[in-house]
Amino acid sequence: MTNLLIINEKPSQFQTFKKALGGEKGTYKGFKYTLCHSYGHLFELKEPAELVSAEKKARYSNWDDLSFYPWDYQDFKWEKRLKMGENAADAAFYQKVFSAIKQKLPGHDAVVIATDTDPSGEGDLLAWEIIEAMGWQGKVFRLNFDDSIPSIQRSFDAMTNVSNKMQNGAYLESTGREQFELLTMQLSRIAKIIAYQSDYKPNTQRIGRLKSVIVDLIYQRTKARDEYVKKPYYELKYKDHSGNIFSRKFTDGVTFRHSNKTAAEQELNAYSTSPIVIDKKEIKKQEPSSLPDLGQVGILVGKHGFKDKEILATYQAMYDKRIVSYPRTETNKIDDDQFAELLPLIDKIAKVVGVDPSLLTHRNLRKKHKTAHAEHGANRPWYNVPESLNQIRKQFGECGVAIYSEVAKAFLAILCEDYVYEKQTAHLQDYPEFKSSINIPKELNYKLVFNEDQLEEKTETDEEPTSFSASASPYIFDGANTKPSKPNKAFILNFLKRKDIGTGATRLQTLADVSQGTDALVKVIKGTYTLTYNGQVQAILCKGTMIASPTITQKLQDGMKAVKNLKMDYRKLPTSVEKIVAHDLPIIKQNAANLRLDKRLAKMKAPKPKFKDKVRGNYLGKEISFNKTWGNHTFTDLEIQDLLANKEITFQAAGKDGNRYPVSGKLAQQTFKGKQYYGFQLNKEKLQQYLEEKKAKDPNRVFCTFEGQNISFKRIWGGHRFTDEEIQKLIQGEKISFSMTSKRGSTYTVTGK
């Protein structure tokens, strides 16, 4: 019987597998098995300078010289290390988790990858990192499932042999993307160098295939709004008693839109009330909208006032409890098994979110919402149905309530009948060029549960139209060219969805990433996304580049799909970066001249520097870099020369008390939060010796032996200077008394010992 070591991605998945298979160890469908789990990625790529040979380290650690770019893919060894985390405790944790998995390996015949089956292939990559680090050379299998118990159990019937990782499309896709993203790091360095050369000081530039598209999109829309000039016009239109509007078809070059009202009023005199002729009436139906991706869930829940980061974290927590389905899915459809899984739960879900069960009469899956097979299926409520929204509120807060309500209603809507409306078209009898078309609701059906109009940028709607009246009268319509809408979440995510860039989860996650932290590229003010100083500089520098182009990003995404389907060598993804950098670097240089011309940037303040200036040089035969400053002291050229020569230097530095002290020290390799670095190391013994000598020479301190111990104390207390006689009494343990003067000028006596 084959003995399997099954690797899960995370503890929650491990617990679900235990339930599905009957325990942490055992037999299942003819296999012996042992379960273990990771905590996501345990490994990471080393820094660029650590991935190349010794003689090339200087080039790949350089942040100042543009001649070192673009990087050469062939120079990289692509080695990984256990993740370091933020501190030594983090590093120890990752080591402990890896060791626990490795200890279970002996005695097994095969390793099984049972991580998330995600669109990016990330689950396969993190599993292979562990497998390779353990030195495993045997068979490797893959289980594909959606984390439900039936799906896990079925996956053993279709286990895939992926022992040759170079034929594992998901692994290759994720590897190619990971290498691509590390190499695009050089664009961030390039942009920062050029910005600093132009005397602009962003504390970061975060250039990447999706981040750059989002930043450019916000920049272009904001710029269009800033440059908008209102151009009023006046146009003759007709309106019937029901409020329906009749107008002529507008095309460039027509003359019926007037720039002044007088001309429109003159035209109005030539027209009169006209009977309406109805051309056509027809009943039409509209199917429920597609199930929302996570980006669209973000739009819906964001309208309740919740931020992207909170939405993502809360949805993930609810998924871990199997209340909602897998967040990072790439489809908006489900298969028959996934639909059948939820059918018995429909009425219970409806009760939780307050939907009338009598509306849920369409119990067959429409073709629009159906796919032959989906690993995870669209975002939807899942098999752990809460008793009430209050139960969710207690566990996940108001954000959880909003998520469940929106996701559940969107799913329940596909169980409703089609929206039915009557489409009417009409024209004016006396002026047939004036036409109108209206849709009159007849049966709302699914729209009573979920209205997809909420996903649009603007959700304001006019009153529902009613049937045409018998006649219509002319009036002058005051119009203007449309001002571009604000760049809100719906605008950004809908644009990316139309361009088919990323999954819904990736789009929402990236939008959250660029708007977080002290080095954010974007900030959100009352639902509107605006660029920070960092983002504005990046947008200006990257205008017209390949990395900020939606078209290029789409091509890269297509390339990743080709790699996944084994139709393209994964190395073509990272090697394409050299071409992108060669194209973009001169454009970024050229765009630097536009920094001073940007009115918004001129009003912004540069953030405080995140990183200190670095010095690079040869130290003990090794190319290193270290901070050019220590405390408030900036090293001189001579001091830098001596430090690199391994000599001790001495300089005056200000202490916390405002006094200056002689400080001595040398360069040394040190460790901070688990990470090694080179920097100035203080000679603490010399400083302590100086302070003691200074204290001994201080005329305002007394040095003596008191109760058998050598001590010192200040000779001045509250403005009173102890006399020699008083000092002798204090040393002998006697009380002394002396006069003091208060702030009000009165005299009082102080006694003490």
Residue ranges and their predicted role:
Residues 9-12, 38-40, 110, 116-122, ...:
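An acidic- and aromatic-residue-enriched active-site/binding cleft used to recognize and process polar
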Residues 1-186, 464, 471-473, 479-483, ...:
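Intrinsically disordered, low-complexity regulatory segments
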Residues 93, 99, 106-107, 152-240, ...:
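C-terminal or mid-to-C-terminal helical accessory/interaction module adjacent to the motor/catalytic core
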